[in-house]
Amino acid sequence: MSSPQDRAQYYIGQLDRELSKYPALNNLERTTGVPKAYAVVGVVVLYFFLIVFNLGGQLLTNIAGFGIPAYYSLDALFSANKEDDTQWLTYWVVFAMFTVVESLVSVVYWFPFYYMFKFVFLLWLSLPAFKGADIIFRSFLAPTLSRYFVHSRPASSNLRAKADSAGKAE
């Protein structure tokens, strides 16, 4: 059985190998002497700490809710695959609905650690491994809004063609 220290070192090594793909982090490691895995973990812990204690919590959660999805959305737009486009379009619809509801209900004042929960929720919504936005969309938004966006042809859609053909017949 491996000790917690061994497991932590294993995961730090995995993270270090993954972060080695990014030249900016390699340069940071060379110039500061701080291993890039420790620097990234430190920044993530600091970011989470600031959110937990609401030191810029609103701004930091909105950056997390926008930054990661914006990167993935742009990546999806420049790819040939259309499935990821649908995933990110779904995210932006859910994110917009959440933002509107959040602005209407002042939940911040009566919900302790609101921004921490919002941060975790936005990560769950946005990270492709969880596909939280798809779950929310299919469970709540699609059943509610689908009746307004039915793509069958309504009776009035052929009205112009019928009027044109009736005018020609006379």
From Swiss-Prot:
Membrane topology summary: Multi-pass membrane protein
Instruction: List the record's Gene Ontology CC terms alphabetically.
Output: endoplasmic reticulum membrane; Golgi membrane
Q: Where in the cell is it found?
A: Endoplasmic reticulum membrane; Golgi apparatus membrane
The protein's job, in short, is: Required to generate and maintain the structure of the tubular endoplasmic reticulum network and the vacuole. Induces high curvature in membranes and causes membrane tubule formation. Involved in membrane/vesicle trafficking.
Family listed: Belongs to the DP1 family.
Q: Which PANTHER family match?
A: HVA22-LIKE PROTEINS (PTHR12300), RECEPTOR EXPRESSION-ENHANCING PROTEIN (PTHR12300:SF161)
Q: Name the chain's protein.
A: Protein YOP1
